[in-house]
Regions:
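Amphipathic, small/basic residue-rich leader segments at the start of a protein or domain
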Residues: 1-76, 92-103, 107, 130
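A short, Trp-centered hydrophobic/proline-enriched beta-strand micro-motif
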Residues: 104-112, 156
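Cytochrome P450 C-terminal beta-domain/meander region
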Residues: 120-138
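A short core secondary-structure module
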Residues: 134, 138-187
Length: 189
């Protein structure tokens, strides 16, 4: 398959170096974008390939066979950034973000993990407060796949509390945040 050939030819020769140096494989990601790997399950009307989930899974599997890092870059971009926008975003958000993400012009990431909570969504400390017609997020995330390399982030934050099964629980929401948003900064590795 195209995925296997690409993985063997373009990804495998660099896999050990990528893992040892922890340098983001930008050139490889750009090549994957050229081949349409970053938008495989995205409908064609949003700039993707319009393929089924099995085709996408085959791509990630072939990449993972030779380089787990590269497979995770693709899956975080596609499954954790594009998919929430496609599933829960407004039409305006889909039109604004998905075509550039699906074509690989922009890279996506997902921010859930926090220093004191790990991936426990109910342990989240990052808060979002509505200020006029804008949400203001305040908190810290860590271990974000595609981190500093990404352009568009899905960030998880607490927006309030709700009653669930007789007890109060945190209401968790997802926000689309663009790199360059005032106050959105990166710590050191």
């Amino acid at each position: 398959t195209l995925f296997r050939e690409f993985a063997e030819k373009e990804v495998k020769p660099l896999a050990q170096e990528v893992d040892e140096t922890e340098v983001f494989p930008r050139a490889t990601v750009e090549k994957m974008a050229k081949y349409g790997f970053l938008g495989i399950p995205v409908p064609k009307e949003y700039g993707g390939q319009g393929c089924d989930p099995l085709t996408y899974a085959m791509c990630v599997e072939e990449l993972a066979k030779v380089c787990g890092t590269t497979a995770v870059i693709v899956s975080a971009h596609t499954s954790l950034c594009i998919d929430p926008i496609m599933t829960y975003g407004t039409e305006e958000q889909k039109q604004k973000y998905v075509p550039a993400l699906a074509k690989g012009e922009k890279l996506g990431a997902f921010g859930l993990t926090e220093p004191g909570a790990g991936t426990d969504a109910q342990g989240q400390q990052t808060k979002a407060v509505l200020d006029g017609d804008e949400w203001v997020l305040n908190g810290s995330k860590c271990f974000i796949t595609n981190g500093k390399e990404a352009d568009v982030y899905i960030i998880i934050a607490v927006t309030g509390t709700i009653e669930k099964r007789g007890r109060k629980v945190k209401e968790i929401s997802a926000f689309i945040v663009e790199k360059g948003t005032p106050g959105f900064t990166f710590g050191t590795k």
